[in-house]
């Protein structure tokens, strides 16, 4: 099955502590989760590793968020939208369900 949300898509968070925020998807994980830039930040206590040159301390990083808690953002309507698939010129393309425009 083709992915409805892909890397570099702009999404809006529907649920959780970051509800209503917009950001780009930086990574799609095979478990059905996404890593979104600046969303779902957690504080990780990092141990120093001098062999790798990693300094210790408390590091803020992005944790995965469930794909069902985000929706793709349609810049034409300014709202969250759903995605459909159709064939154009022999290629499978994604389109927004609200206005039938192609997802860029």
From Swiss-Prot:
GO MF annotations in UniProt: rRNA binding; structural constituent of ribosome
Entry keyword annotation includes tRNA processing: no
Gene Ontology BP term (one): translation
GO cellular component: ribonucleoprotein complex; ribosome
SUPFAM superfamilies registered for this protein in UniProt: Translation proteins SH3-like domain
Domain of life: Bacteria
Keyword annotations: Ribonucleoprotein, Ribosomal protein, RNA-binding, rRNA-binding
Pfam families (alphabetical): KOW (PF00467), ribosomal_L24 (PF17136)
Keyword Ribonucleoprotein listed: yes
Function in brief: One of two assembly initiator proteins, it binds directly to the 5'-end of the 23S rRNA, where it nucleates assembly of the 50S subunit. One of the proteins that surrounds the polypeptide exit tunnel on the outside of the subunit.
Family indicated by similarity: Belongs to the universal ribosomal protein uL24 family.
Quaternary organization: Part of the 50S ribosomal subunit.
The protein, known as: Large ribosomal subunit protein uL24
């Amino acid at each position: 099955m083709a992915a409805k949300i892909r890397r570099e898509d702009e999404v809006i968070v529907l649920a959780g502590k970051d509800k209503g925020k917009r950001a780009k998807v930086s990574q799609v994980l095979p478990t059905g989760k996404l890593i979104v830039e600046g969303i779902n930040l957690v504080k990780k206590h990092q141990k120093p590793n001098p062999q790798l040159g990693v300094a210790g301390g408390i590091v803020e990083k992005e944790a995965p968020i469930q794909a069902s808690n985000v929706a793709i953002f349609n810049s034409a309507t300014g709202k969250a939208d759903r995605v459909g698939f159709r064939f154009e010129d022999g290629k499978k393309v994604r389109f927004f369900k609200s206005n039938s425009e192609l997802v860029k």
